[in-house]
Design a protein with these regions (language model features):
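Short amphipathic alpha-helix adjacent to the substrate-entry channel of hydrolases
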Residues: 161-180
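Conserved alpha/beta-hydrolase "acid-adjacent" motif
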Residues: 274-283
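Short beta-strand element of the alpha/beta-hydrolase
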Residues: 143-153
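Primarily recognizes the serine-hydrolase "nucleophile elbow" in alpha/beta-hydrolase
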Residues: 201-261
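N-terminal cap/lid segment of alpha/beta-hydrolase-fold proteins
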Residues: 29-48, 93-142
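C-terminal catalytic histidine-bearing segment of alpha/beta-hydrolase fold enzymes
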Residues: 2-20, 24, 29, 38-48, ...
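Serine-hydrolase catalytic-loop signature spanning alpha/beta hydrolases and amidase-signature enzymes
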Residues: 154-157, 162, 179, 205
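Short beta-strand/loop motif that positions the catalytic acidic residue
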Residues: 261, 267-269, 273
Length: 331
C-alpha cells in the first residue's frame, strides 16, 4: 500500500479523532485538525475519497478491499456531520434550517458576496491597528440594525478579517444589516486596559458614523469571539455604553464580574472546546443570571470546538440563524 495514501488516511483519521474528542495535551496539533475536520467535513471527505480512487486507478492497491482502511475515517466524518446538524435544534431555531449548501459543499472559503460592499480599514483612532471594516448591502437600506464584531486571538493575535465572516455575510446580504469588524492593538505592546479602551472607541465610532451606511445608531449589537467576547463585555460594562445586546461565541470570560445593568446576552459555546472550556462559559452565564434581570441565552453546541464561525458550514449556518433571531427578539 502506498505511503502517500497511508499518510492521507492517517491525517484524516487523526483529525476525525480530534474532532470527536477533547484531547488537550497536543495543543495546536489537536485544536487545528479538530477545527478543520469539524467545520469542513465535506472538503476533508473529498480529499479522502479522491485519494482512495486515485490509488485504486493507479493499481497501487492489491484489491478494492484494501481501500477499507479509509472506512473508519469516513464513518467518523459522518458522525461529525450528524453532530453539526444538531446545532439547529440545540439553538432552538424555528422553521426549516436554511443552509447555504452551495457554499458549504463547494466553496466554504469564499470571502464575500456581490451584494455586500466592504469599506476597508476606516480609522477610529491613531495608529495602523485602530481600524475597522464596514460591510453594508449594495442597496444601502436605511434604519437597519448594526452589528460590531470584535475578533479573538488570545489578546496577542487575530485580525478583523478572520472570524465571523459567515455571520457578517448572512446578516448583510440576507437582512441588510450594517456590520462592522474591528481591529485593536495587540499585546505585549499594550495593556489589557488599552485594548478595552480601543474597543470602547470603536463602539463610539460606529454609533457616530454608521448612519452614513444605513445603520440605526439606536439598534447596536456588539459581538465578540474568544478573547473578543471578554473585551466586548468589559468595553460595554466599564464604559457604561448603552448597546442593545451582547453576542458571545466561544468566549473567554476569565474573572469578569457581571453587573446588574448588563444588556441582554446570547452566549454560544462549543461542547468540546479545548481552548476555552465550556464549563467556564457556563459558570460565567450563571454569574450573570444571579445579578441581571435581562435575558441571558446560553447554548452549548453538540460536538463543536473553538472557532466554529470561520467557514461556511452546517454549524455556522445554525449560529447565524440564532444570532438573527436574537437580534429580532431584542430589537
Amino acid at each position: 500500500m502506498p505511503i502517500g495514501y497511508l499518510c492521507t488516511v492517517a491525517f484524516v483519521s487523526w483529525g476525525v479523532a480530534c474532532a470527536l474528542t477533547r484531547w488537550r495535551w497536543p495543543g495546536p496539533f489537536s485544536a487545528i485538525p479538530a477545527l478543520l475536520v469539524n467545520e469542513l467535513p465535506f472538503i476533508v471527505g473529498y480529499l479522502l475519497i479522491a485519494s482512495t480512487v486515485l490509488t485504486l486507478v493507479d493499481g497501487d492497491l492489491s484489491s478494492p478491499a484494501g481501500a477499507g482502511v479509509a472506512l473508519p475515517a469516513l464513518g467518523g466524518l459522518a458522525v461529525v456531520v450528524y453532530r453539526a446538524m444538531l446545532a439547529h435544534t440545540a439553538l432552538h431555531n424555528t422553521g426549516k434550517p436554511r443552509r447555504p449548501w452551495g457554499r458549504i459543499l463547494r466553496a466554504p472559503f469564499l470571502p464575500g458576496r456581490r451584494d455586500v460592499v466592504r469599506v476597508r480599514s476606516r480609522a477610529y483612532g491613531d495608529g495602523p491597528s485602530r481600524t475597522l471594516d464596514v460591510y453594508h448591502h449594495r442597496d444601502k437600506p436605511t434604519g437597519v440594525p448594526i452589528l460590531l464584531h470584535v475578533h479573538g486571538g488570545s489578546f496577542r493575535s487575530g485580525d478583523k478579517a478572520r472570524e465571523a465572516r459567515p455571520l457578517i455575510r448572512h446578516l448583510t446580504s440576507r437582512r441588510g444589516f450594517v456590520c462592522v469588524s474591528t481591529n485593536y492593538r495587540l499585546q505585549p505592546y499594550v495593556t489589557l486596559a488599552d485594548q478595552v479602551a480601543d474597543v470602547r472607541e470603536a463602539i463610539t465610532w460606529v454609533r457616530a458614523h454608521a448612519a452614513a451606511y444605513g445603520g440605526d445608531p439606536g439598534s447596536l449589537f456588539v459581538a465578540g469571539s474568544s478573547a473578543g467576547a471578554y473585551l466586548a463585555i468589559r468595553a460595554v460594562c466599564e464604559g457604561e455604553i448603552a448597546v442593545n445586546g451582547l453576542i458571545c461565541r466561544y468566549g473567554y470570560y476569565g474573572n469578569l464580574a457581571p453587573r446588574d445593568d448588563m444588556p441582554p446576552m446570547l452566549v454560544i459555546h462549543g461542547e468540546k472546546d479545548i481552548v476555552a472550556p465550556a464549563p467556564d462559559a457556563s459558570a460565567f452565564v450563571e454569574r450573570v443570571r444571579t445579578v441581571s434581570s435581562r435575558p441571558v441565552i446560553y447554548t452549548e453546541l453538540p460536538g463543536a470546538h473553538h472557532n466554529f464561525d470561520m467557514f461556511e458550514s452546517v454549524r455556522s449556518a445554525a449560529v447565524n440563524a440564532a444570532v438573527e433571531a436574537f437580534i429580532a427578539r431584542i430589537d
